[in-house]
């Protein structure tokens, strides 16, 4: 259904359930559940032939034959990044599932599309949460001005947060970049002085008019038959500048965090790479764009401006959850749907965490981590690698193993 393909898809599952003793006296036990899932059907005879190849490890035999992941309720799932091309660069998806692409879990046996992997032992993987996970991705705009600028957009359902991981020095020589967000404070002050309490109404009216003038020129340029003259290019630049001056400048450096609740105008700019967590909504209102919009035939300017919050943008304040020598844990977002933390560990430091009844998503920014599940095998986490930690893991220990400090992000649903 996520691909909007109505054709039936046949798949099979093989599940293994073992009883594991949890203490020396064998008084307590728990079930270790593992399995794999693959598309298409194996006949009973073919399946039996595969199982007999290694009767001591039947699940491994099938997973290797089908080239699919072994899902273990006590073990992290490694998420393979899926690159999605964009007019401004590319996105790297870790949990995205829709018609444009479906991410996969991966291990030494093979790969499995994430929605299929999550159908195994759903209660132990997700508890009562949806298979539509918190969306985790990277945004990778090219460094070229204008070409690498994202849509000026606003959301009605989607909540999202960016963590800045890289700023291209060719685009921003000082190391400080600009993300456009909210209304510009100078514009607000100007309209408050000239229009008193009516300033929001007048400002948004003028903002809309400026965008309309720019859109008219933009559409001329986007027509394939248009001869783009020097005069038309100059007009496009002038009108774009006039429209974007209504939007505020949020200065960011590597490590900075910007969050966008609903109804907040924003645009990530060229050469600024970020990791993004967001709610699993695929909607937006396009206010304007400095290139041809390929995904729809219209801009949503009037609708967006009628709903946006007419205010200056302010970056979120970080909440310090824990600090000791070589360890810092900060909560950088607390949305209605999920929270996200940044954990920094010096070399050799450890951090113990509990899953409770919530899955965790981890992604590393720098350094290297060894993740030790309560009852599973250690997993290595390198920069820009991501893990899904199932509810059934219970708890885990994370150790900073590289010569450089470890910084990783964790998101979990509410």
PLM regions: where:
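Transition-metal
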Residues: 1-223, 291-314, 340-342
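Residue-level marker of beta-strand positions
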Residues: 16, 49, 257, 263-265, ...
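His/acidic/aromatic-lined binding-pocket segments of jelly-roll/cupin-type domains
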Residues: 152-155, 160-163, 249-250, 257-258, ...
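Ligand-binding loop in jelly-roll beta-barrel domains
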Residues: 157, 167-170, 264-283, 378, ...
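Double-stranded beta-helix
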Residues: 218-219, 225-242, 275-316, 402-414
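Short acidic-glycine-tyrosine-enriched beta hairpin
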Residues: 247-259, 373-393
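C-terminal amphipathic alpha-helical segment
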Residues: 283-356
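Short beta-strand segments in beta-sandwich/barrel cores
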Residues: 350-351, 366-372
